[in-house]
Amino acid sequence: GLTADHRLFDKQVEAFESTYNLLAWDAPGHGKSRPFVMDFTLAQKAAWLHAILQAEGITAPVLVGQSVGGYLSQAYIQAYPGEVRGFVSIDSAPLKRKYMSDKEFWMLNHMAPVYSAMPWKMLRNAAAQGIGITEYAQQNMREMVAQYSRDEFCGLMKHGFIMLAGAIGADLGYDITCPCILLCGEHDKTGATKRYNPMWAAGEHLPLTWVKDAGHN
């Protein structure tokens, strides 16, 4: 997820590491993958992930992406058709342009100043409280956000919005050509995620599961 690092999946890694071969990363500009020049596209980010998986000998991955990680997974499937064994979307949304209104697309391109204008303490609290329902989820996000300076955090948010707008505006196919499940927290309050997921499920004939007592993370 945007601004979150590999610690977002600590509990999932703990649950599945004895059964599955897992790889969790710090995306460019996140966690230990810093400093990083934030001028890349979503397609370039997918290419870097592909190179990492290839280097690790992982040739048919099941991609599990939360929020912006779900967008990245769709870009990966678009760029490397037939290579992905499965896709689990966690509180993400479709990259296909047809699902986003013109107003929403305009807002995506102009969201950065909203975050830059907020006091840093308020911004940190909003990042934690806005995405998590449980104390664990909120504290986990607080710890991940604490590693950034205000400028770093706002820079990540700005680049994330620009990157997504570029990928959506490219209006590529972004067809899900592998087994897929959509997961969405019943209490997700981030953007229009709760509205997009039923549309995505119906439009692409994908199964959607609502997760009880869960927010965005």
Located regions from the model:
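Conserved HGGG/HGGXW glycine-rich cap/lid loop of the alpha/beta-hydrolase fold
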Residues: 1-32, 198
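Residue in the alpha/beta-hydrolase core beta-strand immediately N-terminal to the catalytic nucleophile
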Residues: 26, 62, 85-88
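Conserved acidic catalytic loop of the alpha/beta-hydrolase fold
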Residues: 43-61
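Short beta-strand immediately N-terminal to the catalytic nucleophile in serine-hydrolase-like folds
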Residues: 45, 63-65, 90
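Gly/Ala-rich beta-loop-alpha elbow adjacent to hydrolase catalytic centers
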Residues: 65-69, 73
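Flexible "cap/lid" loop of the alpha/beta hydrolase fold
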Residues: 74, 78, 85-118
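Conserved alpha/beta-hydrolase catalytic His-Asp/Glu region
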Residues: 98-100, 117-175
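Conserved loop-alpha-helix segment in the C-terminal half of the alpha/beta-hydrolase fold
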Residues: 179-215
